[in-house]
A protein has these predicted regions:
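Bacterial N-terminal signal peptides that target proteins for export
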Residues: 1-18
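N-terminal glycine-/serine-/threonine-rich beta1-alpha1-beta2 phosphate-ribose binding loop
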Residues: 14, 22, 31-135, 157-161, ...
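C-terminal helix-rich "cap/oligomerization" subdomain common to oxidoreductases
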Residues: 32-33, 115-116, 294-345
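Hydrophobic residues in well-ordered beta-strands that form the structural core
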Residues: 103, 141, 166-168
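Short helix/strand-capping hinge loops at secondary-structure junctions
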Residues: 136-138, 143-144
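A contiguous active-site-proximal alpha/beta segment in oxidoreductase catalytic domains
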Residues: 145-205
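Rossmann-like dinucleotide-binding domain that binds NAD(P)(H)
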Residues: 193-260, 303-310
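C-terminal substrate-binding/catalytic lobe of Rossmann-fold NAD(P)-dependent oxidoreductases
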Residues: 241-287
Length: 345
């Protein structure tokens, strides 16, 4: 008799291949054709939950979005006000959409092929991700990937050990404005970049993890890997974080807690300087998530996400040191030691 985990893995593979082979007719997948991948949501305490569910479960969905359907959800929740004040409301919204509400993660994993970990409180992402990874379910983790850099490293290492596709990203990375900057040949290459956006904090996690990530993620999309050190200035209303990349490139993020706080970015090129604002909505991210579940290929490398979170933790360390430059290598070394201890347990 085959092992249940092996059987589950074969079923997932068959579904993904089937959906890939019929990608051209995925636009009508909810009405006819191959069955979409059954997706489960963990943590129904963020506005992303009903927003994503409406996108994936839209009968008129096309392409990669149509290859996924939200079929079950586990409410979860923590003592964080942003969680316990909203989990009931969003759970009922999903129930009203015909999505099954399940009272435990193990039970949810029995009913789904892939998982979106949505819990607004990043501190519990590691404990919620572990059973998903051990069950072999491809996993998208909404921002922040974890409550600490060490936990993020553990999640990606476990996913690697268990050969489970896993990725995390802010939706702003995939907004049309950022993507157009990346494709803009008239820039003459990106020599530097500046991004900005709202930056409220969440108790218990590094300052930038909760909302600053939405401005820092596109900064890394534009600059790429290779940040070596971070310097931070903090006032009551503003954060300003400057990163020094290898080859002398500079990327900056301005976090705004008062006054006008739209998202935006500027790319400084060899030939032109081009500015963009935040355009689009969650559909771009959902399309990437759908493609990820269909193909098993992440649009954001684990190494980049880990460096983004090292950047944010280095920003906190710079604040503690009065704005002194902080090496990402040192922050990463400390976090890897903590992650190693957790993995050894």
């Amino acid at each position: 008799m085959s092992h249940p985990a092996a059987h589950s893995g074969r079923m997932l593979c068959c579904r993904a291949v089937f959906c890939s082979l019929f990608a051209t007719i995925c636009g009508s997948v909810h009405a006819a054709g191959p069955a979409p991948l059954r997706a489960g949501m963990i943590g129904l305490d963020t506005s992303h939950v009903p927003a994503f569910a409406k996108i994936f479960n839209n009968p008129k969905a096309t392409g990669d979005i149509a290859c996924v359907r939200i079929s079950a959800g586990y409410p979860g929740g923590t003592d964080l006000p942003a969680s316990h004040d909203r989990v009931g409301k969003f759970t009922e919204e999903l129930r009203g959409m015909g999505i099954e509400i399940i009272d435990s993660i193990p039970k949810l994993l029995e009913k789904v092929d892939v998982v979106l970990l949505e819990s607004v409180d990043g501190r519990i992402h590691l404990q919620e991700a572990v059973p998903v990874i051990k069950a072999g379910k491809p996993l998208f983790i909404d921002k922040p990937v974890a409550g600490s850099l060490a936990d993020a490293i553990v999640i990606y290492e476990l996913a690697k050990q268990h050969h489970v596709p896993c990725f995390s990203s802010s939706s702003v990375r995939f907004s049309p404005g950022i993507q157009e900057l990346l494709k803009n040949q008239e820039l003459g290459g990106i020599a530097g970049a500046a991004t900005w956006g709202p930056c409220t904090y969440q108790e218990g996690t590094p300052d930038m993890f909760f909302y600053g990530i939405h401005g820092i993620e596109p900064l890394f999309a534009l600059m790429g890997l290779g940040c070596e050190s971070v310097t931070r200035i903090q006032t009551k209303d503003t954060d300003f974080v400057a990163g020094l990349w290898k080859n002398g490139r500079v990327g900056t993020y301005r976090g705004i807690r008062r006054n006008k706080s739209d998202f935006g970015a500027v790319a400084f090129g060899g030939k032109r300087i081009v500015q963009t604002g935040k355009e689009g909505d969650y559909e771009e991210l959902c399309r990437e998530v759908g493609r990820f579940f269909r193909t098993g290929k992440s649009p954001v490398a684990a190494e980049e996400t880990i460096e983004i979170f090292a950047f944010m933790e280095a920003a906190d360390e710079s604040k503690r040191q009065g704005g002194a430059p902080v090496s990402l290598a040192g922050v990463l070394a400390k976090a890897k030691a903590e992650a190693g201890a957790k993995l050894a347990k």
